[in-house]
Structures are given as structure tokens and as C-alpha cells.
């Protein structure tokens, strides 16, 4: 699978569709799964990556309350989606409502998944959390 990289800004159309960067489209040619992500965004996984992540989540013990809660959110908020012929992805209204995506969306490549943010929420996130990246405290090899 091609790496999903970069930050792209798009307007949602009146139906709630967002265009994907042309270099992302091949990764989602076999379909995608949208689900609620952490930090106020949506995660969008290519179908093959979703299958791998699903196996990991399904392996969480049913006896663990946090594991059950995580699985409920991960699967319960998920929606299988397809790209249309113009490379657009329809974001279901209920998911747009969950993360506050209205008119402008940020499409962020995060290596093996895509994140979709409301533009204003993404700007707030970067202002609040950009310091951790600048400090390099989680950079590989620094722990």
C-alpha cells in the first residue's frame, strides 16, 4: 500500500462529499471504512488496513470493560464507504455531526490511514498539541 502523507484542505459539497488527493485514491480503490477517531477526527482506513485493525480490536478480551468500550466505539461508529467516479468520499451525516465537520475539511495522511478533520478543529489541535512534536519527546530513539 502507498503511504498516505500530507495535509490537504477541501470544501465539502452540498451532499457531504469530500474529494481525496489523487495520490490517495489508489489506496482506497477497494473501498474504505470510516470510523470515529481520537482527538475529534474521523479515521478512514483502506479496506485491507481495516481488516488488520479489526483483527487487533477483536482480540481485546471481552472480560475487560475498557476493551469492550473501545470495540463498541470502533465498530459501532464505523461505516463502509466507496469512492465515487470523481474520487469523492461521502461522509455520512451522523459522522460529520460527531466531529463537527461542516463545510471545510482537512484530509490528513497518517501513513496507513487518512484522518478527516473539521478545519477549525484541526487548527485548534495543532495549536494545542504542536509542542509535543517540536519538543521531540516521542521521536523514535528518544525514550
Give the residues covered by each predicted segment:
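Flexible "stalk/tail and boundary" regions
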Residues: 1-10, 14-15, 24-81, 85-86, ...
Amino acid at each position: 500500500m502507498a503511504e498516505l502523507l500530507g495535509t490537504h484542505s477541501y470544501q465539502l459539497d452540498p451532499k457531504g462529499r469530500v474529494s481525496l488527493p489523487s495520490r490517495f485514491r489508489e489506496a482506497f480503490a477497494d473501498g474504505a471504512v470510516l470510523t470515529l477517531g481520537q482527538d475529534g477526527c474521523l479515521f478512514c482506513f483502506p479496506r485491507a488496513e481495516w481488516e488488520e485493525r479489526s483483527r487487533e480490536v477483536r482480540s481485546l478480551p471481552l472480560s475487560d470493560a475498557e476493551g469492550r468500550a473501545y470495540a463498541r466505539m470502533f465498530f459501532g461508529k464505523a461505516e463502509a464507504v466507496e469512492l465515487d467516479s470523481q474520487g469523492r468520499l461521502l461522509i455520512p451525516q451522523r459522522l460529520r455531526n460527531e466531529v463537527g465537520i461542516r463545510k471545510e475539511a482537512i484530509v490528513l495522511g497518517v501513513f496507513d490511514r487518512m484522518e478527516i478533520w473539521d478545519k477549525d478543529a484541526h487548527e485548534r489541535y495543532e495549536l494545542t498539541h504542536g509542542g509535543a512534536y517540536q519538543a521531540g519527546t516521542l521521536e523514535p530513539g528518544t525514550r
